[in-house]
């Protein structure tokens, strides 16, 4: 599963790990991606999205119908 949120567009961020002796090594911070199924009453079917936890809050706030409409307007295939 890729570390990409379909709702918010969050991707991994990159930086450095710094040890006690200040040696720096590359690392990445992945968003907390959850694979969730949502029921769309207007279409009578369920869809599965890769969503970050912030994306889940967005869906709770605005509703799945409006979020899916924005995704389709953006060109996401659902």
UniProtKB/Swiss-Prot annotation:
One BP term from GO: translation
Gene Ontology MF annotations: structural constituent of ribosome
Keyword annotations of the record: Ribonucleoprotein, Ribosomal protein
Span of the signal peptide: none
UniProt-listed SUPFAM superfamilies: L28p-like (SSF143800)
Gene Ontology CC terms: ribonucleoprotein complex; ribosome
Region (Disordered): 1-27
InterPro entries: Bacterial_rp_bL28, Ribosomal_bL28, Ribosomal_bL28/bL31-like_sf, Ribosomal_bL28_bact-type, Ribosomal_bL28_sf
Pfam family membership, one: Ribosomal_L28
Keyword Repeat: no
Family to which this protein belongs: Belongs to the bacterial ribosomal protein bL28 family.
NCBIfam families: L28 (TIGR00009)
Protein name: Large ribosomal subunit protein bL28
Species of provenance: Corynebacterium kroppenstedtii (strain DSM 44385 / JCM 11950 / CIP 105744 / CCUG 35717)
Gene: rpmB
């Amino acid at each position: 599963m890729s570390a990409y949120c379909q709702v918010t567009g969050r991707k991994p961020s990159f930086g450095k790990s710094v040890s006690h002796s200040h040696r720096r090594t590359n690392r990445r911070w992945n968003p907390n991606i959850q694979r969730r199924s949502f029921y769309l009453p207007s279409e009578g079917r369920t869809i599965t999205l890769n969503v970050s936890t912030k994306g889940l809050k967005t869906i709770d706030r605005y509703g799945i119908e409006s979020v899916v409409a924005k995704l389709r307007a953006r060109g996401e295939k659902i």
